[in-house]
Every structure is written in structure tokens, then in C-alpha cells.
């Protein structure tokens, strides 16, 4: 569905719809991604009691309007959306950048629960990734999946040719793949490229530099008073190289140990790498 806000037409995907739900759950995507991550997170066991939504932030997916360049601006966008939907005390599940947005919202209004998934704070982004994101989105995706994915599920394709899940989108020349988003070389391990395609396709956006904007927003974000967080849980990947768990971080100071989950043999994208385990945890 689409909801008119002051400066945006917000796209919100409804996973289900019930009257008088116990909770309203919002899945907030990470940098460069959109509502499609919701299709990889099985929340169906909650459909009888709760409404589940996945949303697109401006510049992502189907939401139109001016691009937002800071976590605070994206937080305000979500607050406006919640008010327009007449929803109070939401449950927010934020992945990576989405976790920072959930954190910022939870410091500004009451949330029933905020789940920060693969979100470190502060979330600093290396200069190499920032440069890739600005000039070559495919190279940024390569970096994200190379260092972010530990457990690669096998993807079965129905034909021998690469691109059966998006034929025509790519052009190939001596192992180099060219797309509207940049270039990459898959000569070393073409099977891995096929296996990670279901994840990489989530980064394809009409705004080619949206990943760059998002990553800069993550690096720049500083919460007003991290000691005031409440009703917050954390999910980390044991093998995550992009957002590592730091037990001494102040963000965990007021969180009980039972509300911090470390997923074994999982990197930065648990909804892709270990979806069944993630579903049970959530």
C-alpha cells in the first residue's frame, strides 16, 4: 500500500492484515535494500496475532520523494508514517542501517520492542566501501557479500547459463559482468555468484548512489543519549565482519544477556544465510 506523507509517497508492504492486532511489526531494511528483505524473513507464525509490514525508505523500492541523507531524517520519516497509520508502540526489527533507524526512533517515542539485527554502534564504514558505493554499485555489492556473507546457501538453477534469475540484465565478456550498476568479475567462482544472486538483487535500486548515501548516514550517526535505550534486543552474526558484536559497547549496558543473541556460523545477512534459525529467534 502507499501512504501520502508531507514530502513522500511511502510504500509499505503488508505481509498480512488483521483487525485489533496485539502488535504491529515493522521490518526496516539495511543500506541499499528495500521491503523485499521481508520476503526472506518468515514471520507467518505471528500472522494470527500481529500485523507485519516491510517498508521502503525514500530512494529505495517504490517510495517516492526526496532522498534522505541521515539516520535522523529516516527516523523522522518513520515517525511520520507511524502517526499517519495511527500506530503506537510498534515493534521495530531493523537490519544494519535499519537497526540504527530503529534505535533512533526508540529514543524519541515509545516502542513495544526494538530488535537491532547486525547493527553495531557506532556503525563506521570503511573508505574503500564508500568509494565503491559512490562509483560502482556492483563493486559495493561484491564487497558487502564478500565480507558480509559467511554461509552461502546453494541456489539451484534450471539452466546451464548464468542469469536464469535475471537474463538480459547482465552482459558478459571474458568473465566480466556488466550491468546498469557497474562491473564485476565472476571468473574465479561463477557458482558463488549464482548462489548469492537472491541477496544481491535486493541492492538493485533506481537511485544508483543510494548505497553511498546510506553508508555515509550510518558512519555519521551519533545517538543523543545511548544510555536511555530501553525495550531493545540484539541479534548478531558470529562471523559478521561488517558489524561485529562488542560486549563492552555502551549500547549493551542496560540490556540483559538473554536479549543478546549471537547466531552461529552466520555473517551479516541472517535472513539469507540462516533464515530458519532467524525466524525461530524472532
PLM features per residue range, with description:
Residues 8-64:
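Conserved HGGG/HGGXW glycine-rich cap/lid loop of the alpha/beta-hydrolase fold
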Residues 43-44, 231-266:
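Conserved loop-alpha-helix segment in the C-terminal half of the alpha/beta-hydrolase fold
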Residues 1-9:
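N-terminal cap/lid segment of alpha/beta-hydrolase-fold proteins
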Residues 131-227:
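Conserved alpha/beta-hydrolase catalytic His-Asp/Glu region
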Residues 8, 51-93, 97, 280:
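Active-site loop/oxyanion-hole signature of alpha/beta-hydrolase fold enzymes
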Residues 88-125:
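Conserved hydrolase catalytic core segment
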Residues 29-31, 90, 94-96, 237:
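Conserved alpha/beta-hydrolase "nucleophile elbow" surrounding the catalytic nucleophile
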Residues 256, 272-282:
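Post-His helix in hydrolase/transferase enzymes
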Amino acid at each position: 500500500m502507499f501512504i501520502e506523507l508531507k514530502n513522500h509517497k511511502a510504500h509499505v508492504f503488508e505481509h498480512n492484515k488483521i483487525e485489533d492486532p496485539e502488535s504491529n511489526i515493522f521490518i526496516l531494511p539495511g543500506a541499499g535494500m528495500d521491503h523485499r528483505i521481508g520476503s526472506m524473513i518468515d514471520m507467518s507464525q505471528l500472522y494470527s496475532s500481529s500485523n507485519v509490514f516491510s517498508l521502503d525508505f525514500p530512494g529505495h523500492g517504490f517510495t517516492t520523494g526526496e532522498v534522505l541523507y541521515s539516520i535522523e531524517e529516516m527516523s523522522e520519516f518513520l515517525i511520520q508514517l507511524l502517526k499517519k497509520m495511527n500506530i503506537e508502540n510498534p515493534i521495530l526489527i531493523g537490519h544494519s542501517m535499519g537497526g540504527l533507524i530503529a534505535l533512533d526512533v526508540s529514543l524519541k517515542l515509545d516502542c513495544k520492542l526494538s530488535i537491532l539485527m547486525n547493527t553495531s554502534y557506532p556503525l563506521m564504514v570503511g573508505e574503500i566501501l564508500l568509494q565503491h558505493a559512490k562509483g560502482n554499485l556492483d563493486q559495493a555489492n561484491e564487497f558487502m557479500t564478500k565480507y558480509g556473507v559467511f554461509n552461502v546457501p546453494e541456489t539451484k538453477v534450471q539452466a546451464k547459463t548464468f542469469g536464469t534469475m535475471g537474463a538480459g540484465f547482465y552482459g558478459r565478456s571474458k568473465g566480466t559482468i556488466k550491468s546498469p550498476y557497474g562491473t564485476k568479475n565472476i571468473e574465479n567462482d561463477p557458482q558463488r555468484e549464482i548462489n548469492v544472486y537472491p541477496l544481491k538483487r535486493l541492492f538493485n535500486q533506481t537511485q544508483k548512489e543510494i548505497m553511498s548515501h546510506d553508508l555515509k548516514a550510518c558512519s555519521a550517526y551519533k545517538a543523543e543519549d545511548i544510555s536511555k535505550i530501553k525495550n531493545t534486543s540484539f541479534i548478531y552474526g558470529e562471523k559478521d565482519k561488517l558489524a561485529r558484536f562488542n560486549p563492552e559497547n555502551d549500547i549493551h549496558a542496560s540490556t540483559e544477556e538473554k536479549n543478546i543473541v549471537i547466531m552461529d556460523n552466520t555473517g551479516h545477512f541472517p535472513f539469507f544465510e540462516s533464515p530458519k534459525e532467524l525466524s525461530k529467534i524472532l
